[in-house]
């Protein structure tokens, strides 16, 4: 039996104080807002994907060992802390749960993930699996709880403690916190990168996609994430970029081109603040960022989130 982890947890609401069933429904509504599988992320069938991994794990009497395969990037690390938190206390203690987790592989100088490895290279990783320890479960539960909390300071604190049990977690958390509006201009790191590329007037999203990773230590931005960011920036009031899509683009998320607006150019230059100019209503994990409320921002000089 096998299953995939398909939830882009760094986007949309992941609030605290919900049962697993309630959280599942929140995520399904976010990923398929029109009650159509994959409505916002056409590559996903969230109703199936989000329930399948739970069902596979619950059938523990049908396997001797559960092997988790995860990478070092933000997407995988958030799914890892969720699944470890979910498993802990649900599976019998005698059930073997093992983890294969890598951030590099010989012969792949800019390692992107398991998907680029040949079958024999993937098979070679099996002997490197290690049984999940109690320390790993505890760290995952602490990080998952902090990720879902209504304020991000606890998550900020997690990455400053000893996270060696999950060696890629601290860097992933840091990258997630950089998606908060920055103190310098109100843009997230991803928004700033996309607006920078939009200075090349008329650049296509398909051309922008690989360049979004130029300054990233780990590849995590999906085509759905890029399309969502471009749409948000084009729909803000006033818009920060224009998004032109040909007729019949349909589910092809990256069939379109972008260009900076005057407001986008001013925000990118630091002459205006994105939150002040356009307002904000966004979920990051358990934090609901809204104009008029307590806003948290990423201070790149101090390398932490601060209230503003």
Question: Can you say where each PLM-predicted feature lies in the sequence?
Answer:
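Long, hydrophobic/aromatic-enriched structural stretches that serve as scaffold segments
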Residues: 37-89
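A short acidic (Asp/Glu
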Residues: 14-15, 76-84, 108-113
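Short acidic, hydrophobic short linear motifs in intrinsically disordered regions
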Residues: 201-213, 222
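C-terminal engagement modules used by replication, chromatin/transcription, nuclear envelope/ESCRT
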Residues: 236-308
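A structured, charge-rich N-terminal accessory region that forms the first stable segment of a protein
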Residues: 1-43, 48
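Charge-enriched amphipathic alpha-helical scaffolds
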Residues: 213-245
């Amino acid at each position: 039996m096998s299953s995939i982890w398909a939830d882009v947890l760094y986007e949309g609401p992941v609030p605290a104080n919900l049962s697993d069933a309630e959280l599942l429904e929140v995520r399904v509504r976010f990923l398929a807002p029109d009650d159509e599988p994959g409505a916002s992320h056409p590559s996903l069938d969230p109703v199936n994907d989000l329930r399948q991994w739970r069902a596979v794990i619950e059938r523990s009497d049908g396997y001797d060992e559960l092997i988790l395969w995860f990478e070092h990037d933000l997407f995988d690390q958030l799914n890892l802390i969720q699944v470890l938190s979910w498993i802990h206390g649900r599976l019998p203690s005698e059930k073997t749960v093992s983890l294969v987790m890598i951030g590099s592989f010989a012969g792949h100088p800019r390692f992107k993930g398991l998907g680029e490895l040949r079958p024999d290279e993937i098979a070679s990783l099996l002997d490197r699996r290690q049984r999940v320890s109690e320390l790993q479960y505890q760290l995952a539960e602490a990080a998952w709880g902090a990720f879902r909390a209504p304020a991000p300071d606890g998550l900020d604190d997690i990455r400053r403690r000893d996270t060696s049990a999950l060696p890629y977690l601290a860097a992933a958390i840091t990258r997630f916190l950089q998606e908060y509006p920055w103190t310098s201009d109100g843009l997230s790191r991803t928004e700033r990168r996309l607006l920078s590329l939009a200075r090349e007037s008329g650049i296509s999203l398909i051309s922008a996609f690989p360049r979004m990773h130029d300054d990233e230590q780990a590849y995590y931005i999906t085509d759905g994430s890029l399309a969502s960011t471009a749409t948000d920036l084009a729909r803000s009031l006033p818009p920060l970029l224009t998004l032109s899509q040909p007729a019949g683009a349909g589910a092809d998320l990256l069939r379109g081109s972008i260009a900076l607006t005057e407001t986008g150019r001013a925000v990118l230059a630091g002459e205006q603040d994105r939150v002040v100019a356009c307002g904000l209503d966004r979920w990051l994990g358990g934090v609901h960022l809204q104009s008029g409320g307590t806003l948290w921002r990423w201070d790149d000089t101090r390398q932490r989130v601060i209230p503003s």
